[in-house]
Amino acid sequence: MKALIQRVAKAQVTVAGEEVGAIGPGLLALVGIEPQDDRESIGRMLHRLLNYRVFADAEGRMNLSLAQLGGGLLLVSQFTLAADTRSGLRPSFSSAAPPAQGQALFEALLALARERHPQVAGGRFGAHMRVELVNDGPVTFLLEA
């Protein structure tokens, strides 16, 4: 499982003109599910998302986590993160989880996040989404679990 996280001032996701998720200050996580991922992967990734220290403390150092700040978490499924781009000029998606597995695991990640964190929003799996964000930094990291 991969998550491309971006520290944001705000972010929202819309599907067919309808807002399906939005947050204020926090993290936007674009999540790619791979075939070997399972429920344990979800727990590990959520722990990292909530506890990765990417927010500034009083001295301006990246020393605080989303859990410590209580900011928003916007989870958006993005199977293209699992693409194999090592060769050629076109990505291969054979390294991404099949849609049924990806949807089940993404929805489980979203449900677990909502149990463990007060401000969680999500995109719609498999939909063509428009994601808007105001980057804070910019601060972007690729997490793997």
UniProtKB/Swiss-Prot annotation:
GO terms for molecular function: D-tyrosyl-tRNA(Tyr) deacylase activity; Gly-tRNA(Ala) deacylase activity; Ser(Gly)-tRNA(Ala) hydrolase activity; tRNA binding. InterPro entries: Daa-tRNA_deacyls_DTD, DTD-like_sf. Its main location: cytoplasm. It comes from the Bacteria. It is found in: Cytoplasm. A motif (Gly-cisPro motif, important for rejection of L-amino acids) lies at residues 137-138. Its EC number is 3.1.1.96. One of its GO terms (cellular component) is cytoplasm. Keywords: Cytoplasm, Hydrolase, RNA-binding, tRNA-binding. Gene3D superfamilies: D-tyrosyl-tRNA(Tyr) deacylase. Pfam families: Tyr_Deacylase. One of its GO terms (biological process) is D-amino acid catabolic process. It catalyses: glycyl-tRNA(Ala) + H2O = tRNA(Ala) + glycine + H(+); a D-aminoacyl-tRNA + H2O = a tRNA + a D-alpha-amino acid + H(+). A Gly-cisPro motif from one monomer fits into the active site of the other monomer to allow specific chiral rejection of L-amino acids. Homodimer. An aminoacyl-tRNA editing enzyme that deacylates mischarged D-aminoacyl-tRNAs. Also deacylates mischarged glycyl-tRNA(Ala), protecting cells against glycine mischarging by AlaRS. Acts via tRNA-based rather than protein-based catalysis; rejects L-amino acids rather than detecting D-amino acids in the active site. By recycling D-aminoacyl-tRNA to D-amino acids and free tRNA molecules, this enzyme counteracts the toxicity associated with the formation of D-aminoacyl-tRNA entities in vivo and helps enforce protein L-homochirality. Belongs to the DTD family. This is D-aminoacyl-tRNA deacylase. It comes from Azotobacter vinelandii (strain DJ / ATCC BAA-1303). The gene is dtd.
